[in-house]
C-alpha cells in the first residue's frame, strides 16, 4: 500500500533547506510520496519564470501574486512574503528524484485561491474571498488555465502525479466564518450549480492526464451526498479522503466513492498534524494506531490505494519567520511513526 506525506507549504513558506530535510526524512522512512501544497488564501508560494496566463477571456499578469496572502481569523500567513522561484523548484524536484521520493505538487482550485483572487476580485464567487466563480465562463477558464500552466511545468520536470486540491469550495460564505457554518458545496448542491464543479473536476483530470500524470484531489465535492445526479466524474483521480463532513457539509462516504471506482487515499483528519493543531508533536502514538483501511466514521474500504498523513499550517506564524526549519525538524518523529505503521500493510 502506498504511503504519502502532505505538507501545507502554501500558508507557511518552507525554504529549500527545510524541504530537503523533510525529503531526507521521507527517504529514510521509505515513504513513497511527498505532496507539496503550494497555494492557499494565506500564501501563493511558487512563481514560474513566466507568470503571464492567457485564456479566451484575456491575458493575466500573475507576477504580483506570489508571497503572503491574507488572515482569516486565527489563520494567518507566516509573514515572510517569500515564495519559490522556478530555479528553487527545479532544485527541490531534482532532490526528491535523487532521494527516491516522488513529489506531488498541488495547485488548489476552485477553492483556497484567496491569495490569487486578491489581484483578480472580479473572478470571486459571490460572498467568497477564497473561491473562483466557476459559474462564470471567465472564472472557469481562469481556474483551468492556472492549472494547465503549472501542469505544463511539472510535467516537463518529470512529475508523475499532480493534485488540483478541490477541497472546501467557498467555505467562507457565511458571516460567521472562520467557523464553518455554511459551505459552498452544500449551497451549490441545492441550487443546481454543482454541475459546474463536475465540469471543472473532469476538465482538471483531463489536463493532468493529458500530460501523462496521475491526478489527485480531495474528495469534498465528489458525488456530494452520495448523489450522482449532476453527472459522471472521472475515476482516474485518486481521492484523498479526510472527513465525512458534518450537519451542514455532507460529503460522500468513503465506501460509496470506492464503489464508484475511485482509487482511495486515506487522508484521515484524526491523524492531522501541524501549526494550530494542539500538541501535534505528541501524535506519534495516535499515528501508530492508525489503520489505513478504516476511513472516517469507521467506514472500512477494501483495497485502498494508500494513506496520507497531512501537516497543515493553519497558524503559519507560530514558528516565526524561520522558513519552516523548526517544523521540518519536529515532524520527523511523527513521520517515522506513520512509516512504521504503513509497513504493516
Each model region followed by its residue ranges:
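Structural preference for beta-strand elements that scaffold enzyme active sites
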Residues: 2-6, 33-35, 100-104, 159-163, ...
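Active-site mouth loops of central-metabolism enzymes
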Residues: 3-18, 28, 129-138
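Active-site beta-loop-alpha junctions enriched in small/polar residues
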Residues: 8-12, 39-41, 108-112, 167-169, ...
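Catalytic domains of carbohydrate-active enzymes, especially glycoside hydrolases
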Residues: 18-41
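Non-catalytic positions within long, well-ordered alpha-helices that form the structural scaffold/packing
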Residues: 27-28, 97, 155, 209
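Aromatic- and acidic-residue-enriched carbohydrate-binding clefts of CAZyme catalytic domains
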Residues: 41-97, 112-140, 170-192
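Active-site neighborhood of glycoside hydrolase catalytic domains
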Residues: 121-238, 242-256, 261
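Flexible, acidic glycine-rich loops studded with aromatic residues
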Residues: 215-220, 228-345
Amino acid at each position: 500500500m502506498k504511503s504519502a506525506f502532505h505538507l501545507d507549504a502554501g500558508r507557511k513558506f518552507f525554504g529549500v533547506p527545510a524541504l530537503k530535510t523533510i525529503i531526507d526524512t521521507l527517504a529514510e522512512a521509505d515513504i513513497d510520496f511527498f505532496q507539496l501544497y503550494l497555494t492557499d488564501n494565506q500564501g501563493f508560494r511558487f512563481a514560474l519564470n513566466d507568470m503571464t496566463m492567457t485564456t479566451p477571456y484575456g491575458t493575466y499578469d500573475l507576477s504580483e501574486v506570489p508571497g503572503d496572502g491574507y488572515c482569516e481569523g486565527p489563520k494567518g500567513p507566516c509573514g515572510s512574503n517569500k515564495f519559490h522561484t522556478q530555479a528553487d523548484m527545479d532544485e527541490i524536484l531534482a532532490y526528491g528524484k535523487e532521494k527516491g521520493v516522488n513529489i506531488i505538487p498541488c495547485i488548489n482550485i476552485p477553492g483556497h485561491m484567496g491569495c490569487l483572487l486578491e489581484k483578480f476580485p472580479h473572478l470571486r464567487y459571490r460572498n467568497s474571498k477564497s473561491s473562483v466563480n466557476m459559474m462564470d465562463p471567465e472564472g472557469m477558464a481562469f481556474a483551468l488555465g492556472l492549472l494547465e500552466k503549472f501542469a505544463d511545468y511539472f510535467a516537463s520536470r518529470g512529475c508523475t502525479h499532480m493534485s488540483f486540491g478541490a477541497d472546501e469550495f467557498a467555505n467562507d460564505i457565511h458571516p460567521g466564518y472562520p467557523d464553518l457554518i455554511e459551505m459552498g458545496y452544500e449551497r451549490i448542491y441545492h441550487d443546481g450549480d454543482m454541475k459546474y464543479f463536475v465540469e471543472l473536476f473532469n476538465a482538471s483530470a483531463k489536463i493532468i492526464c493529458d500530460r501523462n500524470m496521475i491526478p489527485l484531489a480531495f474528495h469534498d465535492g465528489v458525488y456530494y451526498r452520495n448523489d450522482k445526479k449532476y453527472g459522471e466524474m472521472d475515476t482516474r483521480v485518486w481521492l484523498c479522503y479526510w472527513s465525512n463532513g458534518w450537519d451542514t457539509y455532507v460529503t460522500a462516504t468513503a465506501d460509496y466513492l470506492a464503489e464508484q471506482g475511485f482509487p482511495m487515499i486515506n487522508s484521515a483528519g484524526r491523524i492531522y498534524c501541524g501549526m494550530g493543531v494542539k500538541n501535534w508533536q505528541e501524535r506519534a502514538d495516535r499515528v501508530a494506531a492508525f489503520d489505513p483501511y478504516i476511513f472516517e466514521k469507521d467506514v472500512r474500504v477494501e483495497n485502498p490505494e494508500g494513506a496520507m498523513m497531512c501537516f497543515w499550517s493553519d497558524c503559519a506564524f507560530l514558528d516565526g519567520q524561520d522558513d519552516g526549519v523548526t517544523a521540518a525538524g519536529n515532524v520527523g518523529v511523527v513521520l517515522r511513526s506513520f512509516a512504521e505503521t504503513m509497513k504493516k500493510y
